[in-house]
Every structure is written in structure tokens, then in C-alpha cells.
Amino acid sequence: MSNKKDVAVKISGGKKIREAREKVKSDALYNLTNAVERLKSASYVKFDPTLEIVMKFGIDPRHSDQMVRGVVNLPAGTGKTVRVAVICKEEREEEAKSAGADLVGSTNIIDEIKAGKINFDVCIATPDMMAVIGSVARILGPKGLMPNPKLGTVTLDIKNAIKNAKSGQVEYRAEKAGIIHAGLGKLSFSDQDLLKNLNAFIEAVIKAKPAGLKGSYLKAMYLSSTMGASVQIDLTSIA
């Protein structure tokens, strides 16, 4: 049975949610600057939420020529600690460790993956290790962790790949419904830093438009914060 203190907390929490929602008009369109300001003022959670973007495109990712996928280096980073695993031959392990890799090795990492122990956010591999990694492709692939040369995670330049992963590189990939979703920093970032990240991400995804696509590309865009409000962006305000 709830006591008076529990009831008071629930009422207080509900009031904060209502007040937050009142600060955002559900039927309004915002430019990026106003959207960031509104989301900050409407946030009520006690942790540092992530600024999230959802973009709806007029594509059908089931067709290979309409797949939209790539990576973006966010100027202000993501605000998250990224654990990087590097799968390489023994002679390059020290280089990977010196560059900041959290996990380094070859068959030892493969064995951990097979055992269900995936303690990393990004997996980087040298080209000569791809045959070995193929044995865990069905495990890493669905999790978005399979090294890919198009994403810069299959490379001879281990140092730069680790630097990019650690400094705020974000991968994007269109889902079945033509939707791309990504986290672009913490709401505690300055407005300027969040806008830098937003502009860099939006520019990269728009440039990734499939060459043979007919009709409009970007259909809708929304910004939100973790457990917070969502606002729709006025596409005419996107340069």
C-alpha cells in the first residue's frame, strides 16, 4: 500500500511531466535553434539525457540502390565513453594499445564473442583478420558491430580509426521504414555544440542521397531528448 510520501512523489513527478509538455507545442514546427532551446527547457529527468534525431526519408532500404548508410564525426563528440576493440595480428597489438584501444587481440576476442561476452561499442579490424572475424559475423552483424571498410572500421590505419571512434563518430543506417535514428550529444552540451553536431549529421545524411532516387528525399525530421518531449523540425529552415 502506498504511503503519503509515495503519493506526493508521484504527484510531483506527474506535475513536472505536464509542465514540460506544456512548453512544447505538439503541432508546431521549429528550426534547429528553437528546437534545442525548447527541449532543454522541457527536460525534467534527473540524469543527463541524450539529444536524439529521427529522420524520415522517401526511400525503400530493401532495394540496395536506396540504402543510406555511413558515419559522421561529430564536432562536439557524443558525451559517451566508447569502448573500442581492435582485432589484429600480434605485431600490431602494441600500436593499438598505445592508441587507446580497450580490448586488443585476435582469437582471444573471437572466443569471447562466441561465448556471448561483448564488452565493446566499436570493433575495428585490420584487413588481414577479416577471414577470422567471419566466424562471428552472424553475432556481430545484427548488433551493428561487424567491422566494415565503408565505415572505416576495417583499416590499416588503426590509430586514426581508434581516434575517430573515441572522439564521437556516429554510424547511421536507414531502417526498413526509411527512418534514421541517432543520438547526437548530451542535453547538457552548450546550444552551440549541439547545433554543430546537428548540422554535421544532417549535412552528411543529406549528401548520402541515393543517386537514382526519384521524388523527395527528406520527408520529416524530429528532435527529442531521452524520456522527454519531441518536436518536429521545419524542413524549410534546413539550409
Curated annotation (Swiss-Prot):
Q: Which SUPFAM superfamilies match?
A: Ribosomal protein L1
GO terms for cellular component? large ribosomal subunit
Q: Does the keyword Ribonucleoprotein apply?
A: yes
GO terms in the biological process aspect are:
regulation of translation; translation
Q: Which InterPro entries match?
A: Ribosom_uL1_bac-type (IPR005878), Ribosomal_uL1 (IPR002143), Ribosomal_uL1-like (IPR023674), Ribosomal_uL1/biogenesis (IPR028364), Ribosomal_uL1_3-a/b-sand (IPR016095), Ribosomal_uL1_CS (IPR023673)
Alphabetized UniProt keyword annotations: Repressor, Ribonucleoprotein, Ribosomal protein, RNA-binding, rRNA-binding, Translation regulation, tRNA-binding
* Lineage top rank: taxon: Bacteria
A Pfam match: Ribosomal_L1
One MF annotation (Gene Ontology) recorded for this entry: structural constituent of ribosome
Q: Which family does it belong to?
A: Belongs to the universal ribosomal protein uL1 family.
Family annotation (NCBIfam families): rplA_bact
Q: How does it assemble?
A: Part of the 50S ribosomal subunit.
What is this protein's function per UniProt? Binds directly to 23S rRNA. The L1 stalk is quite mobile in the ribosome, and is involved in E site tRNA release. Protein L1 is also a translational repressor protein, it controls the translation of the L11 operon by binding to its mRNA.
Q: What is this protein called?
A: Large ribosomal subunit protein uL1
Lineage start: Bacteria, Pseudomonadati, Pseudomonadota, Alphaproteobacteria, Rickettsiales
This chain is encoded by the gene named rplA
